[in-house]
Amino acid sequence: MELFRNLWRRKLRSTLTITGIFMGIVALTTMGALAEHFNSLIAGGVTYFGGAIQVGDAKSGGSFGGGGFMALSKADELAKVDGVAAVSPGITVAAKPGDVNTVSFGLPDFISATDPNGEQYGAFKTQLTSGRRVQSDGEVELGSSMATEFNKKVGDTITLPKKPADAKPDFVTHDYTVVGILKQTLTEPDTGAFVTLHDAQTLLGDSLPAAIKTSVNPYQLAESMTVYGKPGVNLDNLADKINNEVTEVKATKPSVLVNSFKAGGAIFTAITTVAALLALVIGGLSVVNTMLMAVSERVREIGLKKAVGARTGNILREFVTESTLIGTIGGVLGFFVGWLITLVLGGSAGSGGLFLVTPRLTILSLGFAIILGAVAGVLPAFRAARMDPVIALRSVG
């Protein structure tokens, strides 16, 4: 009880000090949760793109964000390249297209062709929490976030793509039977709906501009190809071989994509570090100031304690404990409020969310606040502990 009594001798100063740590931990928690979510996406991307080669139309600059189309027949040519184990054509369309009034800070919902080869050859594998895999047209597997957003379970019917409020008269939707729900991955598949290649090609045809719809056969097209190598094959070398042997395509080396993902992760790690430093500067200096003032105001008390036998260690422990308590209170309150902020903002971030509060972040935030309080109290504690009791008693009339 004496600890709390000492803290509240100067209520305003203690409150401001706790507020300083509180603000720093709120920043650390929210920015850290943002970074944790982004890093989970990075980890999934590194695993997926590091285990396969992405191939796209050469004229559009390759597969990663090129936006072009390639002939489906290219899959057969790619499969004949020495070292290739399997080829999966890919098509992805928006699940909620065209609504300009929709604002989302998370990953967008999408519809994509299933990749049956991915489970056998790919490094990134998904699992089902219920149901089975897509086997025929008219069926769909839903990512965990998308299933929650649309409130769907196995056996339900889902209409995709979702018709926006500003849809044109020729906007087309299709009904699918939900046959499987994917286990949460904390990465891109969570916001996806996965259908057969034929159904994805149908959706691609629906999304084409009216001017070219009649002149293009979507069932002969793919947006990209995912190429899986045989065991032991160097994928970067295989990408070079594809570029040399197959015309009109551009194979991107897995190492290029992996490095781009890691670079993005480094940026968010830096953001978290800045938030931690902010907490250190604001909280640490405020604790040091408060404890130094406490020592100055309690000179006579310290002198009396030492005069009646209190040892240096007792005084040192008392002041370090007080500063640690300040850090703990500010840390707990800051983490709780930061967590609430992630819940509120996360609700407007689309089905994929925006924040991820992990056990690691919880330990980091609370541990940082407690250690900060303890370390910041060391200097004032030493000053108090080394005080001469005779001088201390004389300093106050």
Predicted regions and their residues:
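Mechanotransmission and gating elements of multispan inner-membrane complexes involved in transport
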Residues: 170-177, 181-270
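Juxtamembrane alpha-helical signal-transduction segment immediately C-terminal to a transmembrane helix
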Residues: 34, 38, 42-45, 264, ...
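N-terminal membrane-entry
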Residues: 30, 262-279
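Hydrophobic secondary-structure segments that place a key small or acidic residue at a functional site
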Residues: 91, 109-114, 126-207
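N-terminal Sec/SRP start-transfer signal
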Residues: 1-27, 39, 44, 397
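Transmembrane alpha-helical interface segments in multi-pass membrane proteins
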Residues: 16-19, 23, 272, 279-288, ...
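C-terminal membrane-exit region of the final transmembrane helix in multipass inner-membrane proteins
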Residues: 2-3, 10, 361, 365-397
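Hydrophobic, regular-secondary-structure patches
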Residues: 26-110, 130-136, 240-244, 248-250
